[in-house]
A protein has these predicted regions:
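Noncatalytic nucleic-acid binding interfaces
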Residues: 105
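Helicase motor core with emphasis on the C-terminal RecA-like subdomain
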Residues: 45, 53-58, 63-66, 73-82, ...
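Conserved Rossmann-like nucleotide-cofactor binding loop
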Residues: 114
Length: 388
């Protein structure tokens, strides 16, 4: 049986731009929202204007979305926060703005290399330091097995980036040596260096009740709260995937102290979800139907984007390879490019597939669950989960 989650063309997936504020506000109004202890009203007009100037300078937006100022203010006051918002609602800005506004550093723990690559590439494409092209410097970096710059970690611990992304494995690496380096960075007496917050992105991975439970995530709270220096740094947990008991488990596991909890509905009314019984001929019969539908579509000027973007998930790496190869051959005459992605492939192959999908050079990506968490691509129209 296969499950298809489709986003029809007439209903765009919410982007991370200010254009979706109206839809966001509508969803928030009908959701059950936890009213935070701090409200944006506690910000003086001067403070709010200053934060909005930072927002406009770095991202080009004029105003914050509902709830963002409350979370940012909480973190600037060195208080923990838990953000349970749907995908595309602007969670990332809640930890990006404090770092850019204060000139301090945000450490972000993220579960996947592909997710970190995506966020860092977009940040460095929009936000930078330096006056001209010759002295332009990246604002963000990720530390992990996919990092090609051998000096990236040295530059990070020297305070050359404002947003440092790492995996939970990196956080615990070297018997605590990386944490100690972050601690040294936090206590530097330079006036601007130091950590303003630690963000735990996709924090549902913390919970044993979560669908993506990851043991290394479970250690984050103990690692941070038992560290002599980092225990004072505010933590913000963010996820779009957490039922109430998972939310409670996240807060408990991370040892959050009186956090500002901000919720909204996770319902995405622009998605169509359908379940189809696998045909007698197996998944190849289902794929043939899919290929026939693609071939019937009108070809625009850019044939490679005729089907917009599709992700097909398979349960095993071998099936990923088989399905990707079959689709590539079946769609060869259409100009629709297909690539595969799974953890057994080399870093360069995965990076190439990831970038090509984000830039539209590849229309269909066949992958295991190693791909997809947090991927921000607004023209993704179809997600297929195949169950063999």
């Amino acid at each position: 049986m296969s499950k298809k989650i489709q986003n029809p063309y007439k209903k765009r997936i919410l982007s991370t731009t200010a254009n979706s504020n109206q839809s966001f506000a509508k969803r928030q109004a009908i959701s059950q929202t936890t009213v935070p202890s701090f409200s944006s009203n506690e910000l003086s007009s001067t403070e709010q204007e200053s934060l909005e100037q930072t927002l406009n300078k770095h991202f080009g937006f004029q105003t914050f979305r509902p709830g963002q100022l409350s979370i940012i203010q909480t973190l600037l006051k060195k208080r923990d926060a838990a953000v349970f918002w749907s995908t595309g609602s602007g969670k990332s800005l809640c930890y990006q703005i404090p770092a850019l506004h204060t000139g301090k550093i945000a450490l972000i723990v993220s579960p996947l290399i592909s997710l970190m690559e995506d966020q860092v590439a977009k940040l460095n494409g929009v936000v930078s330091t330096g006056g001209g092209n010759e002295d332009k410097k990246d604002i963000a970096v990720f530390l992990g097995t996919g990092q090609k710059d051998q000096f990236a970690e040295r530059k990070a611990v020297n305070g050359e980036y404002k947003l440092i992304y790492c995996t939970p494995e990196k956080l615990a690496s070297g018997g605590g040596s990386f944490l100690n380096q972050m601690g040294n960075l936090h206590t530097r007496n330079t006036g601007v260096d130091g950590l303003c917050l630690i963000a735990v992105d996709e924090s549902h991975c913390v919970s044993e009740w979560g669908h993506d439970f990851r043991p290394q995530y479970r250690q984050i709270g103990d690692l941070l709260r038992n560290h002599n220096v980092l225990k004072t740094v505010p933590i913000v947990a963010l996820t779009a995937t957490a039922v109430p008991r998972v939310q409670t488990d996240i807060i408990s596991s991370l040892h959050m102290r009186n956090p500002n909890i901000v919720k909204q509905s996770f319902d995405r009314d622009n998605l169509i979800i359908s379940v189809k019984r696998k045909p007698a001929g197996g998944y190849r019969s289902a794929l043939k139907t899919f290929v026939d539908e693609v071939k019937k579509m009108k070809v625009p000027a850019n044939a490679a984007r005729r089907h917009s973007s599709t992700i097909i998930y398979c349960p095993t790496q071998s099936q990923v390879e088989e399905v990707a190869e079959w689709l590539s051959m079946a769609l060869e005459s259409t100009g629709v490019r297909v690539q595969s992605y799974h953890g057994g492939q080399g870093i360069e192959h995965r990076s190439d597939a990831h970038i090509n999908f984000l830039t539209g050079k590849t229309s269909i990506i066949v992958a295991t669950l190693a791909f997809g968490m947090g991927i921000d691509k607004v023209d993704t129209r179809l997600v297929v989960h195949g169950i063999e």
